Amino acid sequence: MRYRPVIGLEIHVQLSTKTKAFCSCPADVFELPPNTAICPVCTGQPGALPVPNEEMIRFAVKTALALNCKIHKYSRFDRKNYFYPDLPKGYQISQYFYPIATEGFLEIDGDEGRKKVRIRRLHLEEDAGKLVHEGDSITRASYSLVDMNRCGVPLIEIVTEPDISSPREARVFMEKLRSIVRYLGVSTGDMEKGALRCDANISVVDTETGRQSNRVEVKNMNSFRFVEKALEYEFERIVKAMERGEDVERETRGWDMTTKTTVSMRGKEEESDYRYFPEPDIPPVVLSDEYLEEVKKELPELPDEKAKRFMREYDLPEYDAKVLTSSKELAEFFEECVKVVNRPKDLSNWIMTEVLRELNERNIEITESKLTPQHFADLFKLMDEGKISIKIAKEIFPEVFETGKMPSQIVEEKGLVQISDEKLIEELVKKAMEQNPKAVQDYKSGKKKAAGFFVGYVMRETKGKANPELTNRIIQKLLEGE
């Protein structure tokens, strides 16, 4: 490929602390009425002094450890100065000169196999407020309203090196990061609610000439799919400009969900534009060896480690293990099921197909469903005893999922118990053979597919309730013995 994208990400993770970064206002403000979770500190009133949230610092250290970062025992807060309607103080408290962590990495399944994406820095900062645009998009809004509730909500910003080689890899990185912060319990990672936000920097290299375009920042991508789509669009836009011999402007562009395009928002700021200087009202953060060791002991088993254990303990293929461990809740559900039904591979197949289909259709997590390990114990027992076929099991599963009823109850109510009476099935097959000698002859002349005719006959006569395995065995026995 002549043109190659070079992508780096700047990711904001909203931390699930009880209170905001520097005051006692609640941090969970998503569903609160506008401007109801604010105080003199988070709105920057004169004389109000910030007090750092220890839980925020602990969450940042946990995340940095999970991302293989170098933790700095000494870090400091700084003021990032800029004007925007949702920033009442006129500056944002962040970490610029001495971040809490640097030099990490996250392994992902890249386009050409396993790869490490380096993490340049991880630092703490407070969130700004939120502009609510009245119109179908930011570019066509007739006016905007300001909600200050989000001011002061604690964030960690994670900045990667430009190691990402495609829009797909950017999406995969984001999905993996969300999985990790959820495992750690430091964030919900919900992009739709703004708990995980991504700005991407993309440039394009012409591999034939070595020429590289200016870097463009892309914002307003509030789902994993939009991260990939926005970067695909921007890559194509930059390539077309380069092919025309045009210079690509260094700017910030926003993803427009309506038009599926990126639109210019403003020129790209330089870091010097923010006039960073040390925050005079907050002392440095100093971490002891004992504190770091204590936090390290709190780390849970993370997705990659859990996937390796699933492969080792349950003899699962790598793909199954990765899917099951992509969600902490799904992995826990699987292990609870294994305790009740010790058939890991069968359970994995059901969870990865039927369960995930139902969850995705409803856009919910496994913890929000009515499904329990006991449902699988009941379902597998029905199949093992020959009372229902796997076909019937899959047909009733959506109702099991929706209602929480036990499979045996649904089977009983709907009269779906499988017929496993050998004598009855044998009589039906013999009757079909007597009435259809041509099908018998076809089978004997080598057309083995003719057996399907007799299967269909038995299923019609029993309204689909005949045990398919038993039916096939009897048909083969009678046809071979003719």
UniProtKB/Swiss-Prot annotation:
One GO BP: glutaminyl-tRNAGln biosynthesis via transamidation
Q: Does the keyword NAD apply?
A: no
Q: InterPro entries this protein is in?
A: Asn/Gln-tRNA_amidoTrfase_suB/E, Asn/Gln-tRNA_Trfase_suB/E_cat, Asn/Gln_amidotransferase, Asn/Gln_tRNA_amidoTrase-B-like, GatB, GatB_C_1, GatB_Yqey_C_2, Gln-tRNA_amidoTrfase_suB_CS
Q: Which UniProt keywords apply?
A: ATP-binding, Ligase, Nucleotide-binding, Protein biosynthesis
Claim: Nucleotide-binding is one of the keywords in the record: yes
One annotated GO molecular function is: glutaminyl-tRNA synthase (glutamine-hydrolyzing) activity
Q: Which domain of life is it from?
A: Bacteria
Q: PANTHER family, alphabetically?
A: GLUTAMYL-TRNA GLN AMIDOTRANSFERASE SUBUNIT B MITOCHONDRIAL AND PROKARYOTIC PET112-RELATED (PTHR11659), GLUTAMYL-TRNA(GLN) AMIDOTRANSFERASE SUBUNIT B, MITOCHONDRIAL (PTHR11659:SF0)
Q: Which family is this sequence assigned to?
A: Belongs to the GatB/GatE family. GatB subfamily.
- What does this chain do? Allows the formation of correctly charged Asn-tRNA(Asn) or Gln-tRNA(Gln) through the transamidation of misacylated Asp-tRNA(Asn) or Glu-tRNA(Gln) in organisms which lack either or both of asparaginyl-tRNA or glutaminyl-tRNA synthetases. The reaction takes place in the presence of glutamine and ATP through an activated phospho-Asp-tRNA(Asn) or phospho-Glu-tRNA(Gln).
- Protein name per the record: Aspartyl/glutamyl-tRNA(Asn/Gln) amidotransferase subunit B
Organism field: Thermotoga petrophila (strain ATCC BAA-488 / DSM 13995 / JCM 10881 / RKU-1)
